[in-house]
Amino acid sequence: MGSFVVGAVGMANAQKIDAKAKKILDDITANYNSKKNSYFKFSFGSGLNGQVTKTEPGIYYVAGEKYKLKIMDTEQIFDGSKIYNINADDMEVTIAKPNGSSTMFSPINYLTTYRNDYNVTYNGKKMVNGVNADFIKLTPVKTNGIKYVYLFVDSVKKQMVKLEQHGTNKDVAVIAIKEYKENQELDPNMFVFDKNKFKNYIITEL
């Protein structure tokens, strides 16, 4: 499931950000940041040669800097200090400090990374999942394994609709948001990693 991992960066170039696209993304970011927490239910599609060949369900909870992302048997938790990658298939957990290469492809991660890492262009309107969405294209300023990213957003509701990540190796990863909720009463331990629940797992701290 490496296709939803954002890669490390290489050579630098001058960044270009379209003003209209920036305002749309900034408005969406401000909307999500104004909430106590947000919940996304989505489908995650992956494949080769630009074609999605596999689709899996996913969920994403975020509150401030903390988040929990789950796609099938792979889960990632960030408790504000460390990232916990949990793989139920392999019964393994890796624990690490956050960095660009350890960030999974989530419904909103590009709302942060575009500010420094991508050239941004506004490409007009496109109907996506019944929404007349604004179409924004990101291309990396530095070599990072990604060819381009398409963001489809509802600028009226100030919400994400769909994301497409296309790799230089022709891998594709797509998140289509199916349901969104905000300001829920979450379990206090939502973003806590409890080692006692993973006694039979191999736990590695990097």
Features from the language model and the residues they span:
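Sec-dependent N-terminal signal peptides
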Residues: 1-4
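N-terminal leader/targeting segments and the immediate start of mature chains
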Residues: 7-52, 65, 197, 202-206
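Beta-turn initiation residues at beta-strand->coil junctions
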Residues: 44-46, 71, 87-88, 164-167
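Short, surface-exposed charged micro-motifs
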Residues: 57-59, 74-75, 119, 148-152
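Flexible, surface-exposed loop/linker segments and immediately adjacent secondary-structure boundaries
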Residues: 98-131
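Gly/Pro-enriched, hydrophobic low-complexity segments
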Residues: 123-125, 129-198, 202-206
